[in-house]
Amino acid sequence: MRLALGLLLSVSFGFPTSFAQTGHSHHSHGAAACPAGIDARGDSSLQTVNLPPSQKCSTSSKSGFMLPDPNCTPGAVNPSLTLAILKDTNFTTRCVRDHATPPADKAKTYHWYQITKPTNNSGQTQTCELDHLISLELGGADTLDNIWPQCGPSHVALAKRFFKRKDTVENFLAKRVRDGKMTLADAQKGIATDWTQFLDEAEKECPGGKCAN
C-alpha cells in the first residue's frame, strides 16, 4: 500500500503522573472505556514508503545495537493520539494495539527483514519483539510502517536484550515529555531516527526501565 507522507505532532506539554506510571506497560484499567476521539487506525508516516516493500529490508548497526531500515520502517505517528488523550487516565495501549494491524500481519515483517520467526518467544526465552519504532505511549501508530522485528542478542539475559533496553528509552522519553524537557514531536522524531542516542541517559535515569516520578 502507498502510505502518505505525514507530519510530526508539534505540540509541547507535559504528561501527568498516571501516564508516567503507564510507561511501557500494556496493562488496562479494568473495563474502563478508552477516551473518545481515538482513531485506532491513524497513520501519519514520517516518510513515504511502499509496503509490502519491493526490496529486502536490512537492519543497520549503531554501537552494537540494531536500527530498522528506514525504507521499510520509517516510523509513524497516530495523529488522533493527542496530548490530551495520552494524558487521559483511561488511555492505555490496549486502546490502539492490534486494532490497525492484527498480530498475524505484523509477523509479516519477519519475512521482510529476512528473519526466521522465533518459536517459544516469550518469557526468558523471548529473543524478538515486533517493536513499535515510535512507541504507542509516545503516540506511535499501530501500522506496518512503524513495526519491525527487533531481535537479540540471545546470549544475554532478557533484561539486556535490545527490545528491553529500548523499552527503557521509551519510558525515559515519556518522562522527559511529561516533565516538559522535550516536546512530543522531538521525542517521536528522535526515537524514530536513532533510539540508541538516548540509551546511556535513559539507563541512568530509569534503571531497569523504571523512572522515578
Please report, for each region that a protein language model flagged, where it lies by residue.
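Nuclease and nuclease-like effector domains acting on nucleic acids or nucleotide cofactors
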Residues: 14-129, 137-213
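Bacterial N-terminal signal peptides
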Residues: 4-14
